[in-house]
Amino acid sequence: MKNGIHPEYKKLLIKVGSNIFETMSTHPIGEILMDVDFRKHPAWNKDSGNVVNQSNKSVSDFNKRFAGLSFDSKKEAS
């Protein structure tokens, strides 16, 4: 392996709320502060609801305004 061509591999702290996770990375900054808890993402935690819709006012307003709008392709036009 050639010297001087690879980025430095160092400790990285990931902060989510009051929890801190430690890992190794080539990320240039030593820590990442997460706004949204990745453990509550609806993709792998069906009980948590939709985090984006709960925390984002624009998305919430859109959903209220277009509550009856459907993109279901199975419905036939009458």
From Swiss-Prot:
Signal sequence range: none
GO molecular function, one term: rRNA binding
InterPro entries: Ribosomal_bL28/bL31-like_sf, Ribosomal_bL31, Ribosomal_bL31_A, Ribosomal_bL31_sf
Presence of keyword RNA-binding: yes
Keywords noted in UniProt: Ribonucleoprotein, Ribosomal protein, RNA-binding, rRNA-binding
Record GO biological process: translation
Gene3D superfamilies referenced in this protein's UniProt entry, alphabetically: Ribosomal protein L31
GO cellular component annotations of the record: ribonucleoprotein complex; ribosome
Record bears the keyword Glycosyltransferase: no
Subunit description: Part of the 50S ribosomal subunit.
Described function: Binds the 23S rRNA.
Protein family: Belongs to the bacterial ribosomal protein bL31 family. Type A subfamily.
HAMAP family: Ribosomal_bL31_1
Protein name: Large ribosomal subunit protein bL31
